[in-house]
Amino acid sequence: MDQSARYADLSLKEEDLIKGGRHILVAYKMKPKSGYGYLEAAAHFAAESSTGTNVEVSTTDDFTKGVDALVYYIDEASEDMRIAYPLELFDRNVTDGRFMLVSFLTLAIGNNQGMGDIEHAKMIDFYVPERCIQMFDGPATDISNLWRILGRPVVNGGYIAGTIIKPKLGLRPEPFAKAAYQFWLGGDFIKNDEPQGNQVFCPLKKVLPLVYDAMKRAQDDTGQAKLFSMNITADDHYEMCARADYALEVFGPDADKLAFLVDGYVGGPGMVTTARRQYPGQYLHYHRAGHGAVTSPSAKRGYTAFVLAKMSRLQGASGIHVGTMGYGKMEGEGDDKIIAYMIERDECQGPVYFQKWYGMKPTTPIISGGMNALRLPGFFENLGHGNVINTAGGGSYGHIDSPAAGAISLRQSYECWKQGADPIEFAKEHKEFARAFESFPKDADKLFPGWREKLGVHK
């Protein structure tokens, strides 16, 4: 059934829709299956994403038609399709009337992903009007809170050197805490790897007090504050809260140094919102494990990593992993810096839409996945700043001297870039950074040809 007469209006102007402030606008890359017209398929897509079904129904009235989602722009050659969703379509909380992300996902990326006349459709951007921004939680804390704890300026406080305890699984409580202490002697921030929680060989209630003791000893030894991001991911709301409450009890007077990590993609928006609302005083660390199933450029359905990050800010993530923009081991490109810009700035041009955040707190870009001191200068140069958290597991524990030396090499790498220094020349005066060349020789050979001769290192 051709529904284009009802669910498409190509006379609508995007600037008028934005000015009106009554719609969420969503841009997709959509291709219909062979034999289906582009506008017909697009209209069916909008119908399935809002008020429609596959036949006319007698219960439809004029009000229903007033909240139809409308296709307002198509370009078949580029596969561009844009749809305007009236705000009235979206579910609101009974308790406080606020928007919920699950409703946005249910409509804008729900049944339309399995339609028989659609070859593929992927969300690449969305626009949220001011009223909608006001109705989402947004972050309660941001990187400025961490800078304050670390004794830094709360504006442009700079790079936070972090790690992931490695190996990701298999360490028992004492070795785990020892690994944390070794890194904290040189670094700032440690996170649980996403599978780490309450394994039988490393029970949470045994390992966490040891981690806190390691933090206190490292703080005493260095005179510097330390940060720990604990995984509270669980299937059940009460289990999440039980883990979080126990951690707050253990850390006691140092609870401000405790962040809560949630696997927001596999756990879903409900997990993120639970952490945001139950623990607004803690830094909310959004890990995105599994996201590549839909965000990968090779996937033609779902949504992009940009969309995921933008949604995380609405939900209230204090920080989210954004990959390494082609400088680490994970899939990505240098142009992915737009992801960081969108979540950290108060206004930003996305792939399609210019988004204003109207004072909503920023979400920190968290950089992770194959990074080390040699790769960081190029990363910072591409991004244009160093106000990020970097969790370098192998880049710390793979350092030839020690995890502490690995952490120091990361800090030195940031200082090298900040000073605009030549990395080889900088290494001659900074031992830990210099030893990173020997620790990661394949990267050194690729990034800095001739480094062995210049640094006096031989095979």
UniProtKB/Swiss-Prot annotation:
Residues binding Mg(2+) are K191, D193, E194
Q: Is Lyase there in the keyword field?
A: yes
Q: Which cofactor does it need?
A: Mg(2+)
GO BP annotations, alphabetical order = reductive pentose-phosphate cycle
**What does the cofactor field's note say?**
Binds 1 Mg(2+) ion per subunit.
According to UniProt, the reaction catalysed is: 2 (2R)-3-phosphoglycerate + 2 H(+) = D-ribulose 1,5-bisphosphate + CO2 + H2O; D-ribulose 1,5-bisphosphate + O2 = 2-phosphoglycolate + (2R)-3-phosphoglycerate + 2 H(+)
**Annotated site, Transition state stabilizer, chain positions:** K329
- Residue numbers of N6-carboxylysine PTMs: K191
Q: What class of enzyme is it?
A: lyase
In this protein, the active site sits at K166, H287
**Care to name a GO molecular-function term for this sequence?**
monooxygenase activity
Question: Pfam families in the record, alphabetically?
Answer: RuBisCO_large, RuBisCO_large_N
Residues involved in substrate binding: N111, K168, R288, H321, S368
What's the EC number here? Answer: 4.1.1.39
> Source organism's superkingdom?
Bacteria
User: Hey, which family's this protein in?
Assistant: Belongs to the RuBisCO large chain family. Type II subfamily.
Q: What does this protein do?
A: RuBisCO catalyzes two reactions: the carboxylation of D-ribulose 1,5-bisphosphate, the primary event in carbon dioxide fixation, as well as the oxidative fragmentation of the pentose substrate. Both reactions occur simultaneously and in competition at the same active site.
Note from the entry: The basic functional RuBisCO is composed of a large chain homodimer in a 'head-to-tail' conformation. In contrast to form I RuBisCO, the form II RuBisCO are composed solely of large subunits.
Subunit record text? The complex is approximately 350 kDa when isolated from either T.denitrificans or R.sphaeroides, suggesting a homohexamer or homooctamer structure.
PANTHER family reported in the protein's UniProt record: RIBULOSE BISPHOSPHATE CARBOXYLASE, RIBULOSE BISPHOSPHATE CARBOXYLASE LARGE CHAIN
Q: What is this protein called?
A: Ribulose bisphosphate carboxylase
Recorded source organism is Thiobacillus denitrificans (strain ATCC 25259 / T1)
